[in-house]
Regions:
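Acidic-basic catalytic patches of nuclease active cores, encompassing PD-(D/E)XK
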Residues: 115-171
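Active-site beta-strand-loop-beta-strand hairpin of nuclease catalytic cores
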Residues: 170-188
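Nuclease-adjacent, charged terminal/linker segments that flank catalytic cores
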Residues: 1-128, 285-290
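Hydrophobic beta-strand scaffold residues
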Residues: 155, 216, 238-239
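Short catalytic-loop micro-motif centered on adjacent basic/acidic residues
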Residues: 189, 215-219
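Domain-level recognition of nuclease-like catalytic cores that cleave nucleotide substrates
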Residues: 222-290
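Arginine/glycine-rich "motif VI" loop of SF2 helicases in the C-terminal RecA-like domain
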Residues: 206-214
Length: 290
């Protein structure tokens, strides 16, 4: 299947790609600023309402900068939330506090926050440790592999950049899987991370799929609109599963992350059914040529 790939290799951030593709936002930066300011002022803000209650997350809490991006991601791109935070810092409504390599923001009028910042630093150090990040990544890849096998997709390659006699040499990168079903081959990338997939990796691997003549299929915790649009323009698919998946045995850490930081995390033994349904629906469309 020949792909019409729109790859913009001269740009290395998706904020730039967004401008080049002229994707119109559904919101203004002023709306994001107002919403983030309300989050730090109003305990009834929408971002505190979904999921189980988290009393330790409230307008008086300190927030890691990346944490705020994820909390707001269903409405705004991460970089736009980051811009809004910068503007609120410039206005003096918020202030920055750096602890080690962690950057926190909190309301400027708050005086007693050091203990809560230190508490969050310990949680961040726990989930960002190499042992946990490796376990989380490997676990999700294993669940994806099981999903493919249960739905009659053949694992053709693992951690590879070559297929059917062609080898990608432009960058030193591999696809997580190359899978096939009914003579259709897919290049698969799996990301079980809180941040978005990096722009350069996204674009390089999209170009790799074009070169190998396979359909790009990314299975991501989340992605910005520009990545969905770029993938659609390349006849591929992003499957989003939203909550970062942890292996069994990490329930205490997952509970602490949610209770203290309201980050979307969960413990699962299989990929969500909606991801499976979307995969099968997409494959049916590919087979039918639509």
């Amino acid at each position: 299947m020949t792909q019409k790939v729109k790859v913009i290799q001269t740009y290395n951030t998706f904020a730039q790609v967004n401008r080049v593709l002229k994707i119109k936002k559904s919101y203004s930066i002023n709306e994001v600023v107002a919403d983030v300011a309300d989050f730090f002022s109003n305990e009834n803000h929408w971002a505190y309402q979904y999921g189980t209650p988290t009393p330790d997350c409230n307008p008086k809490s300190p927030y890691h900068r990346k944490q705020i991006e994820v909390i707001f991601e269903e409405k705004y791109d991460h970089w736009d939330v980051n811009r809004a935070v910068d503007k609120l810092v410039e206005k003096g409504f918020l202030r920055l506090e750096k602890v080690g390599t962690a950057n926190f923001v909190l309301r400027s009028d708050l005086r007693y926050y050091v203990r809560e910042v230190k508490r969050r630093v310990k949680i961040i150090e726990a989930y960002a440790s190499p042992v946990i990040t490796r376990a989380v990544g490997n676990w999700c890849e294993k669940l994806v592999e099981i999903m493919f096998k249960l739905n009659d997709f053949e694992i053709l390659r693992r951690d590879s950049n070559e297929f059917r006699g062609k080898k990608w040499t432009k960058t030193n990168q591999n696809l997580d899987f190359i899978v096939g079903k009914e003579r259709i081959a897919y290049g698969v990338e799996v990301k079980n991370t809180l941040p978005y997939m990096e722009a350069d990796e996204f674009l390089n691997k999209l170009e790799m799929c074009k070169y190998l003549d396979i359909i790009p299929l990314w299975i991501l915790r989340n992605a910005p609109e520009v990545q969905f649009n770029t993938m659609k323009a390349n006849s591929g698919l992003i499957l989003k599963f939203k909550a970062q998946i942890y292996p069994y045995g990490q329930e205490p850490l997952v509970g602490e992350i949610w209770q203290t930081m309201r980050l979307p995390v969960t413990v699962k033994a299989e990929m969500p059914q909606k991801v499976v349904n979307s995969l099968l629906s997409f494959h049916s469309r590919v087979i039918s040529g639509n």
